[in-house]
Amino acid sequence: MKASRFFIGTLKEAPADAEIVSHKLMVRAGMIRRVAGGIYNYLPVGLRSIRKVEAIVREEMNRAGAIELLMPAVQPAELWQESGRWEQYGPELLRFKDRKQNEFVIGPTHEEVVTDIARNQIKSYRQMPVNFYQIQTKFRDEIRPRFGVMRGREFIMKDAYSFDKDHESLKESYKKMYDAYVRIFTRIGFEFRPVAADNGSIGGSGSHEFHVIADTGEDAIAYCPTSDFAANVEAAEALPLLASRAAPAEAMQKVATPGKAKCEAVAELMGIPLERTIKSIVLATDNEGAEPTIWLLMLRGDHDLNEIKTAKLPGLAGHRFATEAEIVEWFGTPPGYLGPIGTKKPVRVVADRTVANMSDFVVGANEVDYHIAGVNWGRDLPEPVVADIRNVKAGDPSPDGKGALDICRGIEVGHVFQLGTKYSDAMGATFIDESGKAQPMVMGCYGIGITRILGAAIEQNFDDKGIVWPEAIAPFEVVLCPMGYDRSDAVREAADKLYADLAAAGIDVILDDRGERPGVMFADWELIGVPHRLVIGERGLKDGKIEYQGRRDAEATLLPADSAAAAVAEKVRAALAR
């Protein structure tokens, strides 16, 4: 590629709405341009990187035995109504009507369409396992698109769907996809972690997210530095921090706490550790034709509620936070002084595992400006329902028993799910098994955010000059910067030969023949992030040398002109082989 025949749309300044590094640099490097909120044009530099990501994904999916197809972006509403997600999905699902008033959606995902394919095409267990995948544009009408390609409304995604005869076979399909994802993200050059995750609106029984480690990540990841354990904080099991309950050592007493509605303020006033206070959270579940059921969830004062875990407890699916009026009706006091002792109306109490092993703790007195200290289970309160309802914290014991947890931030770039029969049951996708009986197909689904990978890679690889691409997805692997290409025959001949030699070696090389000043050339390619640069100048050629500098190198080095192409080609190959 010659730069004079390519489009280079670099900018000196980032747009005012760009909040994170990847968004700023993708615009400045001429990769993307905004069309509307969360919708972007991908300019030639950006598209080259997208195509390289797609190529890696496609190679590894094919290697894992998946079969590529292409499904429509526009999907009929009937399929979503069959699955039940027409009502469940909410405003993120972009719905519209055609001229005949038929309802359609722009697909954010393709479980319904692929299940329709399977139920019409797969009839026997002999046709399974099968795994279909596609690389296609999706649309989710995010309420607040931000961070460039990180949370866009339109995006490119690889989605795959496996169909198996039973759950044991699904586990094998799932493992193949898990391993393929590890290979994909390793080849791209990410520092990443697969983490146990919640299935969310997709449904199913088991899932893993693949997170690129980055300080700007939206997700909190709990991991053990001394083992392989990693999980999304939403899904990580929180073990009790007390092995057993100590015997009571204090009498229960009512304590004045004027104006102290927060656990931190109560602990400071009483001169006790925050860990001895209880945080009371009130939830409600609605009952048709009757008053709601009110729940009091008890957490240690320094812990936070995990709503995803809570929603999985018996009776708490579809819960909501109680209104202030409901709190006053059931507890006799507004929030800030709530507790399980002396409620006006019966409430259901759930204690976190750590709270269940606490002694002599402090709770609200259900009276403004008062708390109760020295409270103990069994003596002052009946034994509670005990459940894991909190988020883990750094320093908590790892669930695998192999050390303590730490917390980092992650950007989700892939997700694999064991769906089971959720969609096949709803949509009648059955096959005939070995005994001649109809059985529901057992499904898995596996997604990778192609365009999000670009943003995640930049969040992990940048400096004050611009992007520092991993070789595998850089728009170009090598840039040639000739000094005076349009003025010096020697420079032009040397640059053209280097270009031809590198291209013949299979290297993705661009020759900057624009005639720009050295400072402009260097700034453009450092901003764009090309991993390897060769500078050809008359002075160096007289000594038989060409200047080489890797994008991560602090200083340039000199290479023999006659072997520079081979040396740089070997550097590229070595980087790609890592």
Curated annotation (Swiss-Prot):
Keywords associated with the record: Aminoacyl-tRNA synthetase, ATP-binding, Cytoplasm, Ligase, Nucleotide-binding, Protein biosynthesis
Catalytic activity: tRNA(Pro) + L-proline + ATP = L-prolyl-tRNA(Pro) + AMP + diphosphate
Keyword Ribonucleoprotein among UniProt keywords: no
Compartment list: Cytoplasm
Subunit and interaction comment: Homodimer.
NCBIfam families reported in the protein's UniProt record: PRK09194.1 (NF006625), proS_fam_II (TIGR00409)
Similarity section: Belongs to the class-II aminoacyl-tRNA synthetase family. ProS type 1 subfamily.
Described function: Catalyzes the attachment of proline to tRNA(Pro) in a two-step reaction: proline is first activated by ATP to form Pro-AMP and then transferred to the acceptor end of tRNA(Pro). As ProRS can inadvertently accommodate and process non-cognate amino acids such as alanine and cysteine, to avoid such errors it has two additional distinct editing activities against alanine. One activity is designated as 'pretransfer' editing and involves the tRNA(Pro)-independent hydrolysis of activated Ala-AMP.
Protein name: Proline--tRNA ligase
Organism listed in the record: Burkholderia mallei (strain ATCC 23344)
Gene: proS
